[in-house]
Amino acid sequence: LSPMGLNDIPAVHPDKPEAARKAGEAVVAALKADRKPRDIITPTSLKNAAVAVTATAGSTNAVLHLLAIAREAGVSRDQFDIDVFDAVSRKTPVIADLKPGGRYMAPDMAAAGGARLLLQRLKAADMLDDAPTVTGKTLFEEADLASETVGQDVILSPDKPLKKRGG
């Protein structure tokens, strides 16, 4: 539950203090707008998270974390469980060339265009559903703000993935 792009910034990057300030402002704005975690953590947002994790060949720990977050947010097992995650991983291609299986690290993904670019690619391939975010913008509005670094080869197109499916 952080504003889009702020977690793209590496911990030791000089922009991190400004990102922390922006995160704090987002918390205050969310409180003023009465946006609560349960308004944002929904079956749709959890499925979108599973798609993003799969598209980056993310850690199996993400499965455990997303399931725990779902339960804490009151999302029932029939709305989001390990079977939903499995179904998502079977139809989501790996499009981010990230370690440990790939060539690049998270800071390289940030330099390429970050989470927004990843989501823009997944949105264009109709693999995501629009949902609210912590900022009040929708996921698709955030994805539409993506800026791709010319010549990057970290985040690929779903029609030319590293692997046809995650897993």
List the model feature ranges, each with a label.
Residues 1-167:
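Catalytic or ion-coupling anion/metal-binding cores of large enzyme and transporter domains
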